[in-house]
């Protein structure tokens, strides 16, 4: 797993890239988010780059991260999902819980 991070507006952008285009283990992402929360950074946008599939264990970690961020008064969202991944997130109703934005430029500039 390759993770790239940077700040944009109020968000910490986290780009996660897997070699096989699937999201299966998000323990590194969870640890990174915990570190952000400890430093008071509570608005996090995650991009899974070219991933077109997400395993159920990864969905569970993602929901757990969403809850941790929410408990700190922050926002965790997904940006720029691959169409295949977007379809899976829609089918699982994840998009009803975690906001999904088409691009970084679509991110809110003030906390929601």
List PLM regions with ranges.
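Short, glycine-/small-residue-enriched flexible loop/hinge segments at domain edges that mediate gating
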Residues: 34-57
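Short acidic, glycine/proline-enriched helix-loop-strand junctions
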Residues: 6-9, 54-75, 96
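Short secondary-structure boundary/capping segments
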Residues: 3-6, 36, 68, 90
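Amphipathic, Lys/Arg-enriched alpha-helical "gate/interface" segment within cytosolic domains
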Residues: 66-109
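STAS-typified acidic loop motif
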Residues: 2-31, 48
């Amino acid at each position: 797993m390759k993770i790239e991070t940077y700040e944009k507006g109020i968000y910490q952008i986290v780009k996660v890239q897997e070699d096989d285009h699937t999201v299966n283990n998000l323990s590194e992402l969870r640890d990174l988010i915990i570190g952000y929360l400890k430093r008071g950074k509570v608005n996090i946008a995650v991009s899974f780059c070219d991933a077109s599939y997400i395993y159920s264990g990864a969905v569970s970690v993602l929901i757990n991260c969403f809850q941790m961020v929410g408990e700190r008064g922050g926002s965790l969202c997904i940006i720029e999902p691959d169409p295949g991944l977007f379809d899976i997130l829609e089918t699982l109703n994840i998009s009803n819980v975690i906001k999904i934005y088409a691009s970084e430029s679509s991110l809110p500039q003030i906390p929601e």
